[in-house]
Regions:
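Short, conserved acidic/polar surface loops in the N-terminal third of protein domains
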Residues: 13-19, 36, 58-61, 119-121
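Conserved structural elements of the adenylate-forming
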Residues: 16-40
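Residue-level signal for inorganic ion chemistry
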Residues: 5, 62, 108
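Conserved adenylation A10 loop of the ANL superfamily
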Residues: 2-17
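Active-site glycine/GP-rich loop and adjacent strand/helix microenvironment
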Residues: 44-46, 59, 68-173
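Conserved AMP-binding loop of ANL adenylate-forming enzymes
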Residues: 34-71
Length: 173
């Protein structure tokens, strides 16, 4: 596999490359710390990925990371809520509604820009959710292609107000 950087540092003209002849070591180096630091209290959790998955972007280590998280730690109802058109808002809303009605903790995973698009959509439709205790947000950073100027603190405040997930359950990778 060849993982490539986005190239934004050089205006998209140069993309760094990271070669992996075998992904077995890469996968283990992802799974073991993920379980230890993100999932120490449970084997599985329902996961909603709000960024591209591995099948959409095979040159992205982040896309592989998110896909592996669902494979190794996702429970029934987990999935990727992003396609070639962007966020699948109707499916995300259904996921969040189910999480609230089931009262089970869930985890959202994605880049910061996806969280902003989700927040904007939820605000526009006057939607808030009270996700179960121990729900968590996994933010991988990256405000690329966002039109809204916001700090990480402001985003975390909005996420807590909109989804009911306290800051201490938000991880930034």
């Amino acid at each position: 596999a060849v993982f490539m950087t986005s190239g934004t540092t050089h205006g998209g003209k140069m993309r760094g490359r990271n070669f992996h002849p075998d992904l077995e070591v890469w996968d283990e180096s992802m799974i073991v710390p993920f379980r230890h630091f993100i999932m120490p209290d449970r084997e599985r959790i329902r996961i909603a990925v709000i960024s591209p998955a591995w099948d959409m972007n095979q040159n992205s280590s982040l896309s592989r990371y998110l896909t592996k998280a669902v494979e190794c730690c996702g429970s029934e109802g987990s999935g990727v809520f992003f396609d070639e058109h962007g966020l699948k808002f109707d499916e995300i809303i259904a996921f969040l509604n189910r999480a609230v009605s089931d009262g089970e903790p869930v985890m959202l995973m994605g880049v910061s820009s996806s969280y902003l698009y989700l927040l904007d959509y939820l605000h526009e439709h006057d939607l808030t959710f009270a996700l179960a205790p121990d729900s968590r947000l996994f933010d991988t950073g990256g405000f690329k292609s966002t039109k809204r100027d916001i700090t990480e603190d402001q985003m975390l405040d909005e996420l807590e107000q909109t989804l009911g997930v306290p800051r201490h359950h938000c991880v930034n990778m």
